[in-house]
From Swiss-Prot:
Protein name per its UniProtKB record: Dynein axonemal assembly factor 1 homolog
One GO cellular component term: axoneme
Any matching Pfam family: LRR_4
Domain spans labelled LRRCT: 189-227
Source species of the chain: Drosophila persimilis
Highest taxon of source: Eukaryota
Record field: compositional bias (Low complexity): 313-327, 1115-1126
Residue ranges, compositional bias (Basic and acidic residues): 1027-1045, 1052-1074, 1270-1284, 1347-1376, 1402-1433
Chain positions of LRR repeats: 38-60, 61-82, 83-104, 105-126, 129-150, 154-175
Gene3D superfamilies xrefs: Ribonuclease Inhibitor (3.80.10.10)
Length: 1501
């Protein structure tokens, strides 16, 4: 359901409106707001089509204003809205942010979908509480357009999406916005250009909570900060930490729920809590267990962790992390110890992880030493097993013995004694095992020694664990004796073991180069007390082992020295290679820092190690020895330094290198400066010496004079060529001396290179040129090494004697300033006069002058193209300029104005014909036609000058002669008329055509020519006879037949004219009577003028190549004139003797009018042929009879006093015109004189033919005076008028057909298509209606009527074709004038002609049996080609005319009033309804068939 104001609202939206007080109140009423403006706090003005903001001063309490989707281009008139908080201006045409100083409470501003290129005027000083800014879909591009955001300290929401921002420096702007929380940048190129876009913006904006389409969570910010600190690895760890925290939080919430449930459940039914390795408690337990395990391993001599670091294995290997994977594995250390002991006992089965393979694969190598060691180890193992078994047996015996003892005495010390005894018994073989192992492994490499040491620690740990299991052993008496001593030994041993472990750990964590050092080197020698054993055998073995250990230690020291020497050699080679690499690359290696983390190279993973340079293999290649195994290459650390230290070392080397280069450059610059100082001192000395010598002489004056001359020329040229900014029209050249046409080619007295020495050069260029000239002159002659004072004096005297010295020295600054002022004043007057004159004559210029890019350009009127101005005139000499100063400024107005040689189109002002000047017209016409004959290879059109001036005698006659006629030529050339002026072009063409005929009237009794004109006419006639004889010699049979037909017409025309001269006085009286009578010749406004051409002109026009249709038209015109003459004889006979004189008068009048119309028709068709014929012959005609009562077409109406000579539109190309008019003045004048002579000869021939024609006309008029026939007494006099009406229509149609035949040359295809589908036009059958009037003539004129009807039928066919062409070519807009003319003729025919023919035809007459129908049938049989164009049944003609229907009764009453009683009218006008279907396109473009009923008057005959 529509709102009441919906219609009004729709009207407001349709167009652009303005905000008015009434409109605002209507909107408030529609939106149910207050009618009092100050009571409203919101106002909805969106989608209203407003152009500007206005009339809102009374709405002072507004807090929200909606102005979106309008056409607002400027923010204005908001000064009174001081409480405004929200302003919505999206979808408008705003280009600048301004005029918001008074809206200090503005919180939200929406300017999206506008044309803003820069953010401005919204800082905190202007809008202190601005919180939200939406400026999407604008034209923001870089950081400069966003720089004003730094001043918005309170802005928290910023939407910049869908702009054109591509500058990554905007991040710096966002960093300086302290309150920015929401930022939208999507849709800008910078999003893809900014690396790590989201992390970068999160780090830049500390308060950012929402970026683009996603929020910024604390987790995102924490990950971004971790990424900034530690790279991607730190970000990964941070993500894991947040994931654990989230899982812990979820688990705690679930456990709290479980605890709440378990409170109300029995213990056996309670649900266990969720546990995970990620919980902090479990992590703490794992970490504490790991710490305890490491502490125990340190105490008991385990070095697994240290070995992991040395071997490159990760600390998360199985053997070190099995206890950390779950809490259950960390319950007890005993089970793990048992597992290790078992694996130690079965080492041969599978080697332990982290141990070197050499310990287990020695037998595979087949080495004798390894086999010996394996055998020795086997024996030692057997001995250890035997000792263990003995100890177990001793334990059993001890247990039995203890049972027999007094339990009370030993109860207090059972466990301690057992432990001490176990230590004494078990420690001895362990020590021996250690010694044996060390003695056998002295010859092994450093790595193997370390492995063995770690293996020994494993044995110690295993034995220690076994001792802890012995809890049930009770001390015996012997053991109790040594209890105190054993405790002391135990303490000492533990201390020594801890020290050994500490020292060994330090050795293992040292550098790679110190790996060869014996880990037991710093071990203290065991004390005698510690090493003392009870067994003598063991004691001896211990001593032996001890001795071997000492030897091994000494040998190890020697090996260490050798290793250090070797290390030094390697360091030298490494340094040499590094130097070579630095010299080759001169850059820091790309992979110095190892996986992006600053850690020792020994902690790098295998992949990182593989990516480094294989220094070990390089070392091997340098030393010439084979490389070690692959695992050493991958696991051995590459450098002893961390990556940071390595980078610092490399940077320091580069700094030293750069410092050396910088020092070298500084030295080089110092040397160059010293050389420059030396050269400068030498040059200054030379210059000083030269200046002294110049001052001594007087040559300075000569140089100064030359420079002053050049400077004055340059300054004057700069002034004269000043740009057009200072003056409205710029430097327009003088029309008095210079034109835009080509200058005459004259030989210049001064060579071009000397004509203007300072042309186009600035002051600096002139000075440089003078310096080059001076230097070249000095270089031509080698300077003498020394100049004596005598030579200087001679040179000074020679300079003083120079002639130009006095002239140069007389100039003073004051005189030069006065000269410059005079030149400036003269230039201003020159420019002002030229500009004023040009502006005063601006109507004559086709083109306009406009300032484009600080230059004055010529803008073409028809095409709009820009062209450069012609070159300005040369500099005016001082003598000429002084004369111009004395002349009056108005003297420029007398200059002859000339036009540019550009294509022209008619102005939009109405065309006004000029008064005819007969002599000039004839001279120019003859000249143009002779020229056209000479240029027969060009297009077959002629040109004629518009007689604008009396004479063309001036110094620049050729330019004037060409330019004055260019406008008239363009008006006549239809090819150059643009499609925008089609109607105007058609009107201009018709006017020109009628002006031509008005100028060449041929019906007056005598030619009112002057003596000069008669002479020229005689010359033109003589030349015309020559041309006619030449033309007849080249005719073919077809042309001869046409000439015969035309000769017959000429004979009849001569008879008519002879008779017309005798009855001229009676004709004048008849005209007066006809003007006062009820039936007039005048057809009212819109009809054509009746004009007649002489037979001579028609004969001369005929072209051998003319079309057949044109010949038929001419033959029809001649034969219809014959028919008109014979019908006039019948009129005379019908009147009888008493009415003979009147019949003669009326018959003569009808004959003359018919002849006029047929001649006019022939002229139109002949002229149409002239437009297309390849050759042109002169057309010389007579003045037409201007009938004041003759109706004229409204397209050719003009004052009868104005007559202008107009010729056929020319087609001569502009290049040929230019070549003809501008080749030379003398040649032009010579051709003019020749053309004048030819014109005089042609005029004389025409005058002779004119006299003969009048004589023949008098004889013909005398022959046509017999008495009328009584059979035709009942035919009224209006018959002659009716006969005259048909040629009138034919003449108009011929004229328009001529135009229509050429309209397709300048109409676009769309207009032609519209014209083809046009519905209205002239009827093709109206000529047949007129033909029927000729069928009732008497049988006496049957022979003459047959020939007339034959040609008339051919004319009708040709007219049908012409009408068809006209309908197909004319545009509906262009045919409005044609339609009016056609309707006027048809209305006249309907009202007069048709009804009057009804009175002529008798009731009992049989139309189909007349001689005319018989002739038509016979002609149709003879000519089957033309039969197709005629109706099948010629006896029933039906013609449809488009007209405004009038009542048939009225026309019948009028005809009955004038009808004689003897004649009964036949009802031939009927109004019938006709139904037919039309295919019509609807609005959607679909074809719809509609049934249409039309009522029309149909004439049946």
């Amino acid at each position: 359901m529509c709102e009441p104001g919906f219609a009004r609202r729709r009207e407001e939206v349709t167009g652009l409106n303005r905000i008015t007080e009434k409109g605002l109140k209507d909107i408030c009423k529609r939106d149910k707001l207050y009618q009092t403006p100050r009571l409203n706090d919101v106002l909805y003005l969106h989608f209203q089509g407003y152009q500007c903001i206005e009339n809102l001063d009374e709405y002072t309490e507004l807090k929200s204003l909606w102005l979106e989707s309008n056409a607002i281009s400027e923010i204005q008139n908001l000064t009174k809205l001081t409480k405004l908080k929200c302003l919505y201006l999206q979808n408008n045409l705003i280009t600048k942010m301004e005029n918001l100083e008074f809206n200090r409470e503005l919180d939200t501003l929406n300017l999206s979908q506008n044309h803003i290129r820069k953010i401005e005027n919204i800082g905190t000083d202007i809008l202190p509480v601005l919180n939200t800014l939406n400026i999407t879909s604008n034209y923001l591009t870089d950081s400069a357009s966003l720089a004003a955001l730094v001043e918005c300290k309170t802005l928290s929401v910023l939407d910049l999406s869908n702009n054109r921002i591509d500058d990554i420096l905007i991040v710096k702007i966002f960093e300086q916005m302290p309150s920015l929380k929401v930022l939208v940048l999507q849709g800008n190129p910078v999003v893809s250009r900014l690396p790590q876009y989201r992390k970068t913006l999160i780090l830049a904006c500390k308060e950012l909570t929402y970026l683009d389409s996603r929020p910024v969570f604390p987790r995102d910010r924490a990950c971004a900060e971790a990424w900034k600190r530690e790279g991607y690895e730190g970000e990964r760890k941070e993500v894991q930490r947040w994931n654990r925290a989230e899982r812990r939080k979820t688990r705690e919430s679930v456990n709290s729920t479980i605890r709440m449930r378990n409170r109300h459940l029995k213990p056996e039914n309670q649900v266990p809590l969720l546990t995970s390795s990620d919980s902090e408690e479990e992590q703490k337990g794992i970490s504490s267990a790991e710490k305890a395990q490491k502490r125990a391993e340190m105490e008991y001599g385990s070095v697994d962790t240290m070995w992991d670091e040395v071997s490159g294995e990760s600390q998360a290997s199985e053997h070190s992390t099995t206890s950390s994977t779950s809490a259950e594995d960390n319950e007890s250390a005993g089970s793990q110890a048992d597992h290790i002991a078992e694996r130690i006992s079965n080492r041969r089965v599978k080697p332990l992880e982290g141990r070197p393979k050499v310990l287990y694969d020695e037998a595979a190598s087949g080495d004798v030493d390894s086999i010996v060691k394996l055998v020795t180890n086997k024996e030692e193992n057997e001995q250890k097993d035997q000792n263990i078994s003995e100890i177990e047996e001793q334990h059993k015996g001890k247990i039995v013995f203890i049972e027999e003892m007094n339990e009370n005495q030993n109860a207090s010390m059972g466990n301690q004694k057992a432990v001490s005894e176990a230590v004494e018994t078990i420690g001895k073989p362990v020590a021996v095992d250690v010694n044996n192992t060390l003695s056998n492994s002295i010859v092994e490499p450093v790595n193997e020694q370390n492995n063995l040491a770690s293996d020994q620690m494993e044995h110690l740990k295993g034995k220690r664990i076994l001792i802890e299991k012995v809890d049930d052993i009770d001390p015996i008496k012997k053991e109790l004796k040594y209890f105190d001593e054993a405790m002391q030994n135990k303490e000492l041993k533990q201390t020594s073991e801890l020290e050994e472990l500490r020292d060994f750990t330090e050795n293992l964590s040292s550098d790679v180069q110190e790996q060869a050092k014996d880990p037991s080197e710093s071990d203290e020698e065991p004390t005698e007390e510690e090493m003392e054993v009870k067994s003598q055998l063991l004691k001896e073995q211990f001593q032996d082992r001890k001795q071997r250990l000492k030897e091994a230690i000494e040998e190890r020291k020697t090996m260490q020295k050798n290793l250090e020497a070797r290390k030094e050699d390697l360091n030298k080679s490494y340094n040499l290679f590094a130097k070579i690499m630095d010299d080759a690359t001169d850059n820091v290696p790309k992979r110095v820092f190892g996986a992006g983390c600053d850690m020792p190279s020994k902690d790098w993973d295998k992949e990182e190690c593989m990516q480094q340079l294989p220094l070990t293999s390089m070392e091997d290649s340098i030393n010439g020895r084979p490389s070690s195994n692959d695992e050493d290459i991958l696991t051995r650390p590459l450098t002893e330094l961390t990556s940071a230290e390595a980078a610092e070392e490399i940077c320091s080397q580069l700094d030293r290198k750069l410092a050396g280069e910088e020092a070298a450059l500084r030295q080089l610059l110092c040397d160059l400066e010293n050389e420059n100082e030396i050269l400068y001192s030498i040059e200054t000395q030379i210059k000083y010496a030269e200046s002294i010598s110049v001052e001594d002489s007087q040559s300075q004056m000569v140089c100064a004079s030359l420079l002053n001359d050049l400077i004055s020329d340059v300054i004057y040229k700069d002034i004269t060529e000043m740009g057009p900014n200072s003056y409205p029209l710029g430097p327009i050249e003088s029309d008095e001396e210079y034109t835009y046409s080509e200058e005459p080619k004259l030989e210049k007295m001064v060579p071009p290179h000397l004509e203007n020495p300072a042309g186009g050069k600035s002051l600096r260029e002139c000075v440089d040129t003078f310096k080059e000239f001076f230097a070249s002159k000095g270089n031509d002659k080698p300077r003498q090494e020394s100049h004596t004072h005598l030579e200087k004096i001679r040179a000074a005297k020679a300079l003083l004697k120079s002639k130009s010295l006095a002239e140069f020295s007389k100039d003073t600054p004051e005189s030069l300033d006065a000269q410059l002022a005079k030149d400036e004043d003269r230039r201003k007057r020159h420019v002002a006069a030229s500009a004023g004159r040009c502006f005063a004559k601006r109507e004559k210029y086709d083109d306009t002058l406009e300032v484009v890019d600080n230059r004055l350009m010529v803008v073409k009127k028809d095409t709009g193209e820009l062209e450069e101005l012609p070159p300005p005139p040369e500099l005016i000499s001082d003598s000429e300029s002084e004369k111009e100063v004395e002349e009056d400024d108005d003297a420029y107005d007398t200059a002859e104005e000339t036009l540019q040689e550009y294509p022209r189109v008619p102005w939009t002002t109405p065309y006004k014909p000029k008064p005819r000047k007969a002599a000039e017209h004839l001279v120019n016409e003859a000249m143009q036609r002779i020229l056209a004959e000479q240029f027969s290879e060009l297009p077959d059109d002629t040109k004629e000058n518009e007689p604008q001036e009396d004479e063309f005698f001036s110094l620049e006659a050729k330019e004037t002669f060409g330019n004055l006629d260019s406008e008239f030529f363009q008006k006549l050339d239809l090819d150059k008329v643009t499609t925008a002026n089609n109607a105007e072009a058609a009107t201009e063409c018709m006017r020109s055509y009628n002006e031509l005929k008005a100028c060449m009237k041929s019906g007056s009794t005598e030619l009112q020519l002057t003596s000069e004109e008669n002479e020229m006419l005689q010359e033109m006639l003589s030349s015309n006879e020559d041309l006619e004889a030449k033309h007849k010699s080249n005719d073919d049979p077809l042309v001869e037949r046409d000439n015969e037909l035309l000769n017959k017409m000429m004979q009849r025309m001569k008879e008519h004219e002879e008779r017309a001269r005798e009855l001229q006085e009676q004709l004048e009286k008849e005209k007066e009577e006809e003007n006062s009578g009820p039936i007039k010749l005048s057809m009212g406004e819109g009809s054509m003028l009746y004009q007649r051409w002489s037979p001579l002109s028609l004969t001369e026009i005929i072209d051998p190549q003319a079309e057949e249709g044109g010949r038929q038209a001419e033959e029809g015109g001649a034969q219809q004139e014959e028919g008109g003459a014979q019908s006039e004889e019948r009129d005379d006979q019908a009147e009888g003797v008493p009415q003979a004189e009147e019949g003669v008068t009326q018959g003569e009048e009808s004959v003359l009018q018919e002849e006029e119309t047929h001649a006019e028709n022939g002229v139109a068709q002949a002229e149409g042929r002239v437009l297309q014929s390849p050759e042109i012959y002169p057309i010389i005609g007579y003045e037409d009879i201007d009938d004041d009562d003759a109706a004229s077409d409204f397209t050719t109406d003009y004052s009868s006093d104005d007559e202008v000579a107009v010729v056929v539109p020319p087609k001569i190309s502009p290049a040929m015109l230019k070549a003809y008019y501008y080749d030379g003045f003398e040649e032009d004048m010579r051709m003019v004189r020749e053309n004048e002579a030819r014109t005089r000869r042609g005029l004389r021939a025409i005058m002779q033919k004119e006299k003969q024609m009048w004589k023949d006309n008098e004889e013909m008029a005398a022959d046509m005076a017999p008495s009328p026939s009584p059979k035709e007494e009942h035919i009224p006099e209006v018959k002659t008028e009716t006969e005259t009406a048909k040629p009138t229509v034919e003449t108009a149609k011929d004229k328009w057909a001529k135009i229509a035949s050429r309209l397709n040359e300048f109409l676009d295809p769309e207009a032609m298509e519209q014209l083809e589908s046009h519905e209205f036009g002239e009827s093709d059958g109206e000529d047949d209606v007129d033909l029927t009037g000729l069928q009732n003539y008497d049988e006496e004129s049957e022979t003459e009527c047959e020939s007339a009807l034959k040609e008339t039928a051919e004319i009708g066919d040709s007219e049908k074709q012409e009408n068809k062409t006209q309908d197909e070519t004319l545009d509906p807009k262009d045919t409005e004038a044609i339609t009016d003319v056609t309707l006027g003729i048809q209305r006249l025919k309907r009202q007069k002609l048709i009804c009057q023919w009804e009175k002529i035809i008798p009731e009992d007459s049989k139309i189909g049996d007349g001689p005319t129908e018989k002739f038509l049938d016979q002609k149709a049989q003879d000519n089957p080609e033309t039969t197709d164009e005629r109706p099948e049944n010629p006896k029933n003609f039906i013609t449809l005319d488009y007209f405004v229907d009038t009542e048939p009764s009225e026309s019948l009453e009028d005809t009955e009033a004038t009808e004689t009683p003897e004649v009964s009218t036949e009802q031939t006008l009927k109004t019938e309804q006709m139904e037919f279907n039309l295919d019509v396109l609807n609005d959607d473009g679909d074809v719809v068939i509609k049934e249409v009923t039309v009522e029309a008057q149909v004439t049946y005959q």
